[in-house]
């Protein structure tokens, strides 16, 4: 059954435009509360990133949940993976995150976690959607939900992150620059790395509600690159606005993407005989990652794009590590969802174990040239399914004669078609990508 509101990563859009409006959030809170209550007693955690609209939507969700008889525990600004973790530790029935992740401040959205700290099953999302179309009724006064605020949430999560590395671990002597994207990691990330002994310089940790992801964080890396060079740091770590993506910069100022970080983590676990199975990537993962893992004898499979699909594949195979080149990295030994801080700590542990710098460690993966072009798509017929686009993709694939890949897909979170071409000749790959992107734009007009 097709979902009306939920995309690949919850519900997301422009603030003030349906469905990202206060009245819809009120009804969504009620519908979610009714759905969760139908499964038993109900406590729901609610957290958010640092967008100014988060306060408005927090109040609306709180009212809707209470009207359905659900007790609400407010966490304030916290990373998305922290809310997944705290939902489990408080034994709540569900967690809700108010965030649009790496998007600008005038977007916002809602993500749900189950009581196990994982994404909601499809059947629960469909139940919520059915209730959204039903009349809203308030439970009797004696059954209204209570609302409380959790004041020590940050401290709990900081200790959880630190527990993902051995208690004897010290990063003393390591000089690190953190870019917190003026987002949800702005308090907790500096504390985690400082308490583990690193010398930390912090960028973009002064959120004002409007500057989240603005020319900073994992989607705008130039500030971090410059700071790593200026500070003569060993490496830089960039988070996105809600703390579920991480990218890095080595001491030369070069960007280290999610594929490379995933390789470093997986190789370390493999060398310590702790990998358990193989690695899950996505359709967008660089071919070089697959080849490098194969050289180590590590199985690799591709899931659809989106961390929920990576997680589903990990669960099905009982594997522990997966991720996306965008920086969503899942380390199931420690967390139930993509966690940027924990992933970064696993990378630092791997570097420490091998006695290597980040620049040295990334050399184990030789990436194939890959060009990604985003084409704005206003709606209507999916251009990926257009006959002319399909024919062009087949022609380009045939021309690369088994030495490359073509992937076109509609984004699940933004009005974009992503055109990706990968092969062994960078100039040719770029030409093919631009040709296909131009065609997609033409058929979308």
Swiss-Prot record:
Keyword Phosphoprotein: yes
Keyword Nucleus applies: no
UniProt GO cellular component terms: cytosol
Pfam families, per the entry: PGM_PMM_I, PGM_PMM_II, PGM_PMM_III, PGM_PMM_IV
Organism: Pseudomonas fluorescens (strain ATCC BAA-477 / NRRL B-23932 / Pf-5)
UniProt PTM comment: Activated by phosphorylation.
Catalytic activity: alpha-D-glucosamine 1-phosphate = D-glucosamine 6-phosphate
Cofactor: Mg(2+)
Catalytic residues, chain numbering: 101
Modification type Phosphoserine: residues: 101
GO biological process: carbohydrate metabolic process; peptidoglycan biosynthetic process; UDP-N-acetylglucosamine biosynthetic process
Enzyme Commission designation: 5.4.2.10
Family the entry assigns: Belongs to the phosphohexose mutase family.
Residues annotated for Mg(2+) binding in this entry: 101, 240, 242, 244
Record's keyword terms, sorted: Isomerase, Magnesium, Metal-binding, Phosphoprotein
Protein name: Phosphoglucosamine mutase
Domain of life of the source: Bacteria
InterPro entries linked: A-D-PHexomutase_a/b/a-I, A-D-PHexomutase_a/b/a-I/II/III, A-D-PHexomutase_a/b/a-II, A-D-PHexomutase_a/b/a-III, A-D-PHexomutase_C, A-D-PHexomutase_C_sf, A-D-PHexomutase_CS, Alpha-D-phosphohexomutase_SF
Function: Catalyzes the conversion of glucosamine-6-phosphate to glucosamine-1-phosphate.
HAMAP family on file: GlmM_B
GO MF, one example: phosphomannomutase activity
